[in-house]
Amino acid sequence: MGSEMCIRDRAHAGWRGSVEEIALKTVQMMCRHYGCNPEKMLAAIGPSIGSCCYEVDDKVLTAGAKYRECFTLKPNGKYHLDLWLMNRLQLEAAGLERGNIHCAATCTCDNRELFFSYRAELGKTGRMGVSICRR
């Protein structure tokens, strides 16, 4: 193979996966197994619940303590989690260039006419599939 490869991967990054650093570990695995160069990688963070709607409890706050800057204390005394920021920070820590990380910045909870939202629909949702294609 030449120096430029076309490897694709995807990972689900809810709060558990995010605090367990799934984005960072996915990049590390791709580098280890395929010899990828993170500086040449592209990443996309797709639609998901935004920090505007993602109120979390103390269990999540404690589990994500390493990423304290991803939690915002709201006037009601509750914390909201920014999964987009948490995963961006992990991708950057793995060596991806900031300009190579695209975030859809689309909240599924605020856009229920377009997406299912487990949180907004109290678990009574349809399902979404994600595929990665080469053009």
Predicted regions, residues:
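Active-site microenvironment for binding and transforming phosphate-containing groups
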Residues: S3, I7-R135
